[in-house]
Amino acid sequence: SMLLTMIINKIIIKSDIILLIIIIKTYEANMTLRELKTGQSATVTVVGGEGALRQHFLDMGIIPGTRVVLTKFAPMGDPMELNINGYELTLRLADAGRIEVEDITDREAAECEVKAAAERAEGRNKDKTAENAALIPHPGLGEGGKYHDKKAEHPLPKGTPLTFALAGNQNCGKTTLFNQMTGSNQHVGNFPGVTVDRKDGVIRGQDKALVTDLPGIYSMSPYSNEEIVTREFILREKPKGIINIVDATNIERNLFLTMQLMELDVPMVLALNMMDEVRENGGTIRVNQLEELLGIPVVPISAAKNEGIDELISHSIHVARYQESPKRLDFCDENDHGGAVHRCIHGIMDLIGDHAEKAGIPVRFAACKLIESDQMVLKRLELDENEQEMLEHIITQMEKERGLDRAAAIADMRYSFIRRICAQTVVRPHESKEHIRSRKMDQVLTGKYTAIPCFIGIMALVFWLTFNVIGAFLQNLLEQLISFLTTVTDHALVSAGVNGVLHSLIINGIFNGVGSVLSFLPIIVTLFFFLSMMEDSGYIARVAFVMDKPLRKIGLSGRSIVPLLVGFGCTVPGVMASRTMPSERDRKMTILLTPFMSCSAKLPIYVFFTAAFFPHSAGIVMVGLYVLGVLLGILMAVIYRKTLFQGEAVPFVMELPNYRMPGAKSVGQLLWEKAKDFLQRAFTVIFIATIIIWFLQTFDAHLNVVSDSQSSILALVASLLAPVFAPLGFGDWRISTALIAGFMAKESVVATLSVLFGDVASIRQVLTPLAAGSLLVFCLLYTPCIAAITSVKRELGSKWAIAMVIGQCVIAWIAAYGVHLIGVLVGLS
């Protein structure tokens, strides 16, 4: 019995050990990315999520087997910053919880580094001639016959216009390159159906060569408007060539997009940008060998220093004119992981060949997108039921053989190819000076206790310089110029004996109306100068990282903070600044919430009424108005989140670029575009609106010129609206007239009241302090000025603009009525 007891005890002990091992293994297997500690390394084992979100994870390089290091958390604990394949990436904790990882010990991390170094050394030693490739000048046009073989050429007829697509990741210098290639020969517009900027430019020295600057993207998956726009442009407009710019300091990440562009089988040139930084930090890239491995021309450039641009243009013109498609479209073979992915891709290509040709989609590109479950491609191919079943069977078989799901298998295939070619062609630089500088700056600008004070300080400085120093000074000069021109024109019209109505139209309608709006131009240009400096330097990405958590609680993202803050200065640039937001949902919400941030044009109204009715508590009243606007904005954000903008929150997967000094040419080009855009609106929509307001103020219902504004159509309309405001305590028609004039420009409210009432004493006879408080709340919240509404119309369309006008007026009425009602209940008068 003792022997039996001992055997049983040993069995129990062994079973406990086995159970403990199982528990430990289960724990390790189920460890997620969000459980990592700062500085901890791990290997991705499972990528969770579904649909576009999961595909975006994979596109950004988060695939099984990838090593990640948790760099830090945002000051408020969410999101986190990761280092993946040498670049920084942000991820929310909720999204990180969908990614399972396996912890890497310090020893394992060192072994991985040694192994990676050995692989790089092996790749460098594969071909001794490649060791000296960096010393060999890059081949010129026609040399070597590598890409200019007569057999590969399909020349276009002479005189055929050449069109190019300029594509690349965000923050890779694409805009700088576009400006260098085109100079001032640019046209800015929108892609059809979306509010994504489209820039077209004529290549300098090539009158019949047009290049389109496509949005910065990371892949050709239909994850964002930018990616859809890029893909549809290439597939439908069929440019004669693609210029793909990549950041040479982060080449692995950038080549992921390159491979997908090559699958489109369009003549293509690769521009290796920032090669000067690579060399300065002790690294190099064997350009000739990279060309051989990719099968496309590769041109080293520095867009910021205007180096290599002429050679890039020459190669681009050549491959487009002779239609030299990429020599390589296959990035895996039958030896890669048993050939599962290779067989799958080629099997699908055989299956869908005719459909792809009919749909105008390159067959290799279509096959890969079908494996990734791209529904847009599947719909365009119009496969029948049997073909779809066969497609699913081929993909399922590949998943079993490869041991990865379909989307992960394709992403792994691409990144595996990238790692192989980089091992042979890239000599790793030391940690760059730019990265070292960025890490030091981030210790302060994204530090736990310093990030928010720094942000507040920077924005306060921007606002002070814009609205009190530089912008205000330039605005004052422009106002003086407009006033001078108005006076000169007025005297000229009087001297010429021009008809009084025409005189009034020119002076009161055009000069005073359009002139009042034009005076905002210096403010907008100055503000966008600072915003572009912050954006191009990489700081705005850090602001989004820091502010994401509090804004996400009300349905926004970290990127919303800057447009909303700009809205305190002026709603127009606030709305325009929202264009930098990648999410259409967040962009719309941000635009709709911007009017709740009290703009500086309303400040004269606050000062006027607080001085007249609340002289001893003016500061408290004004601060209260700003706070009320923010609180109501938060409330509306929550309502929007539960009604108009329901659905899954857009993940915060964003690359944090190194800090860089923005190029003067790029900043200048941006400021010119913004100024030109504003001027175009000032002399179109705003011009028409001012004429309408002038007409209503000048004529009565019988179209007779009025001598007293009380008889005008505007006064008639105001008298009809007056009963609407009676419950709020300000039912006088003159108040209604001022509010209507405020639709033109908020500064007009005080000016109109001064004209109609004469002095403050007359206003005190009509309004009680309670009614004045109610009126202040209404002015805080009612419809923005015509310039702001025009901006909203341009960004969101007419329906949203009209809805904003009506919605803001309704919200303002309800809030003002609430203030009036509460005042009456507590005995105020």
Residue ranges and their predicted role:
Residues 445-545:
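Core alpha-helical transmembrane segments of integral membrane proteins
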Residues 600-623, 787-797, 818-829:
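Transmembrane helix-loop junctions at the membrane interface of multipass transporters and ion channels
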Residues 480, 484-488, 541-571, 646-670:
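Juxtamembrane inter-helical linkers in multi-pass membrane proteins
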Residues 136-219:
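Conserved G1/Walker A P-loop phosphate-binding module
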Residues 231-297:
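Conserved C-terminal guanine-recognition region of P-loop GTPase G domains, centered on the G4
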Residues 408-409, 428, 472-510, 554, ...:
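Extended, low-charge hydrophobic alpha-helical regions
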Residues 269, 279-430:
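Alpha-helical transmembrane helix bundles of large polytopic membrane transport and channel proteins
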Residues 454-465, 527-532, 610-612, 625-639, ...:
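Hydrophobic core segments of alpha-helical transmembrane domains in multi-pass membrane transport
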